[in-house]
Amino acid sequence: MEPGRNQLFVVILLTSACLVYCSQYVTVFYGIPAWKNASIPLFCATKNRDTWGTIQCLPDNDDYQEIILNVTEAFDAWNNTVTEQAVEDVWHLFETSIKPCVKLTPLCVAMNCSRVQGNTTTPNPRTSSSTTSRPPTSAASIINETSNCIENNTCAGLGYEEMMQCEFNMKGLEQDKKRRYKDTWYLEDVVCDNTTAGTCYMRHCNTSIIKESCDKHYWDAMRFRYCAPPGFALLRCNDTNYSGFEPKCTKVVAASCTRMMETQTSTWFGFNGTRAENRTYIYWHGRDNRTIISLNKYYNLTMRCKRPGNKTVLPITLMSGLVFHSQPINTRPRQAWCRFGGRWREAMQEVKQTLVQHPRYKGINDTGKINFTKPGAGSDPEVAFMWTNCRGEFLYCNMTWFLNWVEDKNQTRRNYCHIKQIINTWHKVGKNVYLPPREGELACESTVTSIIANIDIDKNRTHTNITFSAEVAELYRLELGDYKLIEITPIGFAPTDQRRYSSTPVRNKRGVFVLGFLGFLATAGSAMGARSLTLSAQSRTLLAGIVQQQQQLLDVVKRQQEMLRLTVWGTKNLQARVTAIEKYLKHQAQLNSWGCAFRQVCHTTVPWVNDSLSPDWKNMTWQEWEKQVRYLEANISQSLEEAQIQQEKNMYELQKLNSWDILGNWFDLTSWVKYIQYGVHIVVGIIALRIAIYVVQLLSRFRKGYRPVFSSPPGYLQQIHIHKDRGQPANEGTEEDVGGDSGYDLWPWPINYVQFLIHLLTRLLIGLYNICRDLLSKNSPTRRLISQSLTAIRDWLRLKAAQLQYGCEWIQEAFQAFARTTRETLAGAWGWLWEAARRIGRGILAVPRRIRQGAELALL
């Protein structure tokens, strides 16, 4: 029984020690390299801040370094706040540049229109027949820069744009009178009862909005980059095989700004993109057939569009403050045309080969059965035609000839590009009327860098169509789809065995390397334990970066505060500044509510909420740990706040006691007021005690049958003094115990009363003295008893220590015996396994020999 008791005692002792020393407490870390996805507004930076669209942007000095992170992150170009903001912002810039000012009432009036007849004999392109000429060869379909037809505007397929001359009645400045106005419309923009003459209306007049251009801003190219506000950052997937959707990208870099991008608004093709490389690659939607194909810049693909002829614009006043721009045209303006240059056939063949090699592609591998096709019939003009904008004019180009050309098929004619004023909005549902276009001759030359397309695979997988698309937003999936916006969360929780924070100042080592605003993110791929030692420098770097970016934003806002209404960037700059300040103040308020203000490592008294959840300080990163404990942050935060409130209460009570440590505080004026209060309380207590004693004495005398002499009413003075012989024995009195009080009869009753009070107080003090003396007399036995108890406890502890030592030796011997038995068992098992494996191997090696012997026996 004795060894069993010793073992049980050892187990209980070890368990108690583990409970005391192995408890885990919440520790707050500030400056950890962790983040979460965010969706806050970005702001822009550009080198050219002289244009109207980028005047609110920060100056771009190309000082945007990227830091490699040793982490794995998910990227999605279609579920991405960066690309969504780019689409929204470019749309607002587009709207502002083309029509930044006044909304006019839709021109839904009946117009008497007739077709404009030109002075030339050029056939109407709508009625021209393809049988008037033989199908040209592919070489003849290319217009060179030196062709005479370009200078003379007589190239094949280049005709006049059909116009309609219309008249309508409307009130002008004089509201009581109607005036008749004349206007010229493109034939495609009006709907008439009769194609030659009759009543016509502006197409989509009930769903269109006319917006006038104030300052002749046109949709010119603008280059800028997005930057994250302070406290946020941008991650980029640097994997070469990234195709728009990657749940586990291993090559991740951190940056404060994106690459430089250029505004694009077109269908079918993307122009002047910044992602073109010496290869063709495809961004493919994760759950759809939508793609954006980046073309190889080696083939030098270009498109040059031109609108020849003169064009003038004449304003017509409809009413006060409302002006409609008419187009008086002496001769019909010529249609626009576009010429494609470069090695297009080779580029399109490489697109097909890249599609076949794409991991998402499940169709036929024969590139000869992969064709480029146009969208189906019945689509909007922006879908059916290639739509682009050339300095104010909206061109709709029929690309049938282009598809035949790149597929090396015979073509019947080369089509032109229509010019329209009423177009469908590419970002929102609706139609807009854009007025006025730029006067004079227009020419645009762009580099074709991408194709917007849908991959349509036949059910039987016999052929595949690459269908051109009108999703303008896909252009920005390619430009910014490899970025994602994150919010840096520098506050983290982790369990440690330290319960209190040590306020001992620590001297920082010399030569701390400051990494910059994103420098601490470079440690995101390192272990938690290694990075906890550098949190001080990281938090200082984070704060310095926030302050620096705040100052830059504030300078821009101050310089351009009178022009914030012009573009979307002014509002974004203000919002980015406010967001950064709110984020920093929120973090400091949180740390302060937990009692951890301005501390990098703050130990608390709050126990860790989940003992089974513990970090691997040597192998786990802070980002991995934060993903595991993110659901516990609310409970931990609440517990820390409650602990801090209790700590403040304890500190308040402790400070009240500390005020008595200094002798000077005892003589403070405020202390004397307290002393007076204490004195009043003592006097009141004495009076109450005397009243109680008086009542007790009165009751005692009543029990003895006496009526006290001093019970007479106040103010009564005895005139007859009773002189009693002091020498008379006590037993001669008429009452018992009267002799003891004979001394009080010599005085009148008030003096007797005072003597009685003094006598009672003396007896009270003597009683207290006797009690204290008795207690002190009993102190010696108590001391002897305490000494004996301490001796017994010491002997008991020595006995238990000996038992603990014996138990430890017994456990050590048991472990040694267990290890010896295990080693012998494993050695025997290994020998048996080795013998069995050897026999099986010999049997397998003997199989061919047995087969040969069996065959020989069978042949015999």
Curated annotation (Swiss-Prot):
Residues 511-531 are annotated as: Fusion peptide. Residues 23-678 are extracellular. The surface protein gp120 (SU) attaches the virus to the host lymphoid cell by binding to the primary receptor CD4. This interaction induces a structural rearrangement creating a high affinity binding site for a chemokine coreceptor like CXCR4 and/or CCR5. This peculiar 2 stage receptor-interaction strategy allows gp120 to maintain the highly conserved coreceptor-binding site in a cryptic conformation, protected from neutralizing antibodies. Since CD4 also displays a binding site for the disulfide-isomerase P4HB/PDI, a P4HB/PDI-CD4-CXCR4-gp120 complex may form. The surface protein gp120 is a ligand for CD209/DC-SIGN and CLEC4M/DC-SIGNR, which are respectively found on dendritic cells (DCs), and on endothelial cells of liver sinusoids and lymph node sinuses. These interactions allow capture of viral particles at mucosal surfaces by these cells and subsequent transmission to permissive cells. DCs are professional antigen presenting cells, critical for host immunity by inducing specific immune responses against a broad variety of pathogens. It comes from Human immunodeficiency virus type 2 subtype A (isolate BEN). The lineage of its organism: Viruses, Riboviria, Pararnavirae, Artverviricota, Revtraviricetes. The gene is env. Disulfide bonds join 44-57, 101-214, 108-205, 113-166, 227-257, 237-249, 305-338, 390-444, 397-417. Residues 166-205 are annotated as: V2. Residues 1-22 form the signal peptide. InterPro entries: Gp120_core_sf, GP41-like, HIV1_Gp120. Residues 397-417 are annotated as: V4. GO terms for molecular function: structural molecule activity. Glycans are attached at residues 37, 70, 79, 112, 119, 144, 152, 194, 206, 238, 241, 272, 278, 289, 300, 310, 365, 371, 398, 410, 460, 465, 610, 619, 635. This is Envelope glycoprotein gp160. Residues 119-139 have a biased composition (Low complexity). The chain crosses the membrane at residues 679-699.
